[in-house]
Amino acid sequence: KVVLATPIAETSLTIEGVRAVIDSGLCRKLVFDARTQLSALQTVRISLDMATQRMGRAGRVAEGVCYRLWSKASESRMLSQRLPEIEEADLAPLLLDVVAFGEQHVEELPWLTLPPRPERILATERLRNLGAITTENSITPIGKKMAQLPCHPRIARMMLSAPSKEMQALACDIAALIEEKDPLAETESGADLSLRITRLRQARSLHQIGRWSRIAQIAREYQRMIHTEQSNTDVSPEDCGLLIALAYPERVAKSTDGVGHFRLADGNNAQ
């Protein structure tokens, strides 16, 4: 048996018969970008402690061998230890939970690793933009409801603020699509969200759910949580845009003069 090393190979899991490990020196991890305020999977170099753990899979039950696919020069540039996840993660979900528990001063909690101050400030600002907390860091009524949903605060705000039952059903479909792997190839459909909603609803209507099954299941769970019903009616791009704007209010262009000139989220101007 051969293990192509992934983070699974860093656990204490023992697989009988494994005598060799091939380590690419890479891993996929979810990294939060403070500039875009979005999280994305990135392929990054592992640290030396991760490499040591991966190597250990080859010798759990007998002598084995580990093939490392990098040079000594590359190894000299590797970090000795992985960064704590809290230093790279989106802190908004964590801070919302902390405030929901009644703690307004996050830095006073006994953290093993204190969340970085710049990221705490950004996360707090995002939660205020979403209406989840006040300027005094107290939780709002809608913030309490957001904290009860098992999803990112952005997604929770979108579902809870949808203005009608039909829009609530659409918000649940959008939430499921955002959280799961895109079932359509980008070359096939670009980045059109309304097209994906249409395909999902067609699949449900025809009872040909196929590759949409996981997304449909998540949407159904969210609909149950917010007490709304599934819908397979036609959807408009405008409705999708309105709901996405509820989740990402800081991404909406702001009018600068009231006559057609706008400031974009990246600081550029448009008209």
Question: Where in the sequence are the language-model features?
Answer:
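Conserved motor-coupling elements within RecA-like helicase/translocase cores
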Residues: 1-3
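Alpha-helical architecture
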Residues: 5, 21, 54-55, 138
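Conserved helicase motor
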Residues: 6-10
